[in-house]
Amino acid sequence: MSSVVVVGTQWGDEGKGKITDFLSEHAEVVARYQGGNNAGHTIVFGGVKYKLHLIPSGIFYKEKICVIGNGLVVDPKALLEELKYLHDRGVSTDNLRVSNRAHVILPYHLKQDELEEASKGDNKIGTTKKGIGPAYMDKAARIGIRMADLLDREAFKEKLERNLAQKNRLFEKMYDTEGFSVEEIFEEYFEYGQQIAQYVCDTSVVLNDALDNNHRVLFEGAQGVMLDIDHGTYPFVTSSNPIAGGVTVGTGVGPAKVTRVVGVCKAYTSRVGDGPFPTELHDEIGHQIREVGREYGTTTGRPRRVGWFDSVVVRHARRVSGLTDLSLNSIDVLTGISTLKICVAYKYNGEVIDEVPANLNILAKCEPVYEELPGWTEDITGVRSLDELPENARKYVERVSELTGIQLSMFSVGPDRNQTNIVRNVYEA
């Protein structure tokens, strides 16, 4: 039995999709455990670039089972659009499995998301307006509609009628806008369910059977640790748990069955949306990193905020996710910068602190304590081993591993999968 979790160690967009795709080659099952279509990942496969938001990265390997676990919230319309996107490009999806316990995003979730975000004014969270938060709210409030309900005509209609009575009062009284009729949603979404039905099953059984038969299972996280609803920069977070612990609740696989946890990070830091960002760069170097690294959101197209590598953040991720391995991406983006900086601690009111404060007012006032390292000018995009890196690039990579306390297992020097290099095999480590 071998199972590996891929976790983002920063604010998402660390290159998890590429690393998951890379590791998928040696897995027999690939599963997502949280989030929804708010997370985008770009994958280059067979020389073609694909953008996925919901379906696991392993879908391009038709012999591998791909699972959308119970911890996700699924927009049926978006899922069908993504399936069509793949079918139109000749990609089979017969290997997809969708949990019958996954919650469903409906039109009122999308509307609620947009209205709530607009009402917050300057205090907005930076939501992608995909209905993710409201769907998780309904799940916690025990009024959510699950995939199993969507496939049951009577159950779906009964729950939809109940929910709309409540949601429409919310829209009318709080937002002074019209709600939805049952007719506007019911037939359309029931039909979506019928189109998805062939993929729906108890995915906990699928995953545990695979593990019990000594198959390699890869768990794919979305977003990142700093967007985790419990351990991230709350409230500027997502509505689920991207940390490795999310695997257990989001797939129905016990924690003892997880063997390795790979933390993925960039050689710098980026984030989309609002919230404190201690190492953020507003200068020409920041602009250079953004343009060279093509730092624009896969889902939103928004320019990402960028900054120096923050080892305080990644150490936090190591602790709360139990990281065993490090995958360092986008090292090539730093080429040509004469002096590189790594944040080793924060300074607040004259005191040096080594951990991420829970109080965001404190975090916003933290000043990064930097360690400087010399940069490099050599083209490293063709490098295939640590020894081939220029001395300064290798020292930078090694210092990141030292400061975070995580053993390096992979590093990337470009966006293509053949630019990802293995230092040690995470399935056998």
From Swiss-Prot:
Keywords noted in UniProt: Cytoplasm, GTP-binding, Ligase, Magnesium, Metal-binding, Nucleotide-binding, Purine biosynthesis
Cofactor(s) in the UniProt record: Mg(2+)
Q: Name one Pfam family in it.
A: Adenylsucc_synt
Report a single Gene Ontology molecular function: adenylosuccinate synthase activity
Superkingdom of this entry's organism?
A: Bacteria
InterPro entries assigned to the protein according to its UniProt record, in alphabetical order:
Adenylosuccin_syn_GTP-bd, Adenylosuccin_syn_Lys_AS, Adenylosuccinate_synth_dom1, Adenylosuccinate_synth_dom2, Adenylosuccinate_synth_dom3, Adenylosuccinate_synthetase, P-loop_NTPase
Location within or outside the cell: Cytoplasm
Reactions mediated catalytically:
IMP + L-aspartate + GTP = N(6)-(1,2-dicarboxyethyl)-AMP + GDP + phosphate + 2 H(+)
Q: What is this protein called?
A: Adenylosuccinate synthetase
Which organism's genome codes for this protein?
A: Bacillus cereus (strain ATCC 10987 / NRS 248)
Recall the taxonomic lineage recorded for the source organism. Answer: Bacteria, Bacillati, Bacillota, Bacilli, Bacillales
Gene giving rise to this polypeptide: purA
